[in-house]
């Protein structure tokens, strides 16, 4: 029941705790991207349990506005070890309880997705499906 978060620090311009995410590579599905990015950014081997939803955001660069769409998945890992990907400016990573992760996260859209994913997790637990062979 803990949430993997990453701390990104990019040249003092971008700093804060985020959820793992990334860009779809040619020929990849959203699911493959999610599993690959979690591993690349944190060293964690995750297994998808359920699709949670998508979020959209944009940011400005000097010559344009970049639009992003992120597909989110509830995942499970076999342990609590993580290693931040320094090449992508991740300087820390860890697993946190829901309320800790919620308050750490920098972006409101990630907080909304976290809340939705956590409620999905609680529903599966209440139904005795979390950890069942149906999902593993």
Regions found by a protein language model. Give the residues of each.
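Charged phosphate-binding loop/patch that engages nucleotide di/tri-phosphates or the phosphate backbone
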Residues: 103-136
């Amino acid at each position: 029941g803990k949430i993997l978060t990453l701390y990104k620090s990019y040249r003092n311009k971008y700093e804060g705790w985020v959820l793992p995410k990334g860009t779809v590579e040619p020929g990849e599905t959203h699911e493959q991207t999610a599993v690959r990015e979690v591993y690349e950014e944190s060293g964690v081997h995750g297994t998808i349990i359920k699709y949670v939803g998508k979020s959209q955001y944009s940011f400005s660069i000097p010559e344009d506005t970049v639009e992003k769409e992120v597909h989110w998945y509830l995942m499970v890992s076999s342990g609590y070890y993580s290693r931040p990907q320094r090449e992508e400016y991740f300087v820390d990573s860890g697993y946190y309880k829901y309320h800790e992760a919620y308050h750490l996260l920098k972006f409101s859209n990630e907080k909304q997705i976290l809340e939705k994913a956590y409620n999905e997790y609680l529903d599966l637990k209440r139904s005795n499906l979390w950890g069942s062979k149906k999902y593993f």
